[in-house]
């Protein structure tokens, strides 16, 4: 396995969670594992799916984080863009200075 040197963060609507998880799991050679958590977001790109979200000014989202090799992150992004082309999926890549396990 390549040395992980970046963190891919994906934020997307809860309705896309199963599709996103399925697509990431189809590429174990790129992403060995990931973490998901429910979050709320707001901003110019937010699409409000309910009256409640419009009133609150926030949208429910899922945040997926994957620590991986940067070249694999770009490959995975390409796969996801092709499989799930929507402006409702945001991503960014951040450097990882060190990654390990306690045992």
Regions found by a protein language model. Give the residues of each.
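Positively charged, small/polar-rich N-terminal and surface patches that mediate targeting and assembly
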Residues: 1-103
């Amino acid at each position: 396995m390549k040395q992980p040197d970046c963190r891919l963060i994906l934020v997307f609507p809860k309705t896309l969670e199963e599709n996103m998880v399925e697509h990431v799991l189809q590429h174990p050679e790129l992403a060995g594992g990931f973490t998901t958590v429910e979050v709320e977001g707001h901003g110019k790109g937010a699409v409000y799916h309910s009256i409640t979200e419009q009133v609150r000014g926030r949208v429910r989202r899922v945040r997926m984080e994957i620590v991986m090799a940067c070249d694999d992150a770009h490959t995975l992004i390409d796969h996801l863009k092709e499989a799930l082309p929507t402006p409702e999926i945001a991503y960014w890549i951040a450097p990882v200075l060190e990654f390990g396990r306690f045992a």
